[in-house]
Amino acid sequence: MSRRLVRVGLGGLIASGKSSLAAALVASTALHEAIGGAVEHVDADALLRVARSTDVALRDAILQGVPEARRADGSLDSALLAARAFADPAVMNRLEELQWPVVRQAISDVSRNAEARGVRLLLVEAIALGRSGLAAELDGALLLQVDEDIRRQRFVARGGSADDFERRNAAQAAVAAEMTGIGAVPIDGSGSLPETVHAASQALRRLCLQGESTD
């Protein structure tokens, strides 16, 4: 029997390991068997990077607000743009107003394609699942929780600075409350990846099988 596509958000603060967890879940044969189908992953940030490079109207609107982010060739300086956004809440809010509608449409397109191919579970990775409006289009969400010290160590280990971590972490201070507000299931990500995969898989199985017989 064909089962409907289930769309679940995967959120968490910076350096919480969202992408690593998503990749492990996509590769988990045990999860596929438990929910009765394939698992795929879409990253909102990746979709946004594509949109910034291909959507001229979006790029022009962004540059109107942050003109110093324009490179000599007319493209966006993403690093400078991110620095401005994390340093100035007004810039962050304006960017989100411009970008999230584009991301929601892109994820809707990905979702339709996945459903047409018979995918069982689509993991939607995004930090701002609540205020982006994405949560309203999902069947549930997971909140990956990792101690701040661990996240800082991970961020620095992959080449970031401690100061940059503090700026980005502070800018995301409201994320946990937003995720709680949309009913996200908390997942402890402070342990090993296999432990986190197990906990997330259990939660995903419950979300996928809601309203269905588990016999």
Show which residues each predicted segment covers.
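P-loop (Walker A) phosphate-binding loop of NTP-binding proteins
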Residues: 13
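Hydrophobic anchor at the beta1->P-loop junction of P-loop NTPases
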Residues: 10
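Small-molecule kinase domains that catalyze NTP-dependent phosphoryl transfer to phosphate-bearing small molecules
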Residues: 107, 131-137, 156-215
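ATP-dependent NMP and nucleoside kinases share a basic, alpha-helical "lid"
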Residues: 108-116, 121-157
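Walker A/P-loop
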Residues: 19
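ATP-binding Walker
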Residues: 16
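ATP-dependent small-molecule kinase phosphotransfer cores
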Residues: 46-119
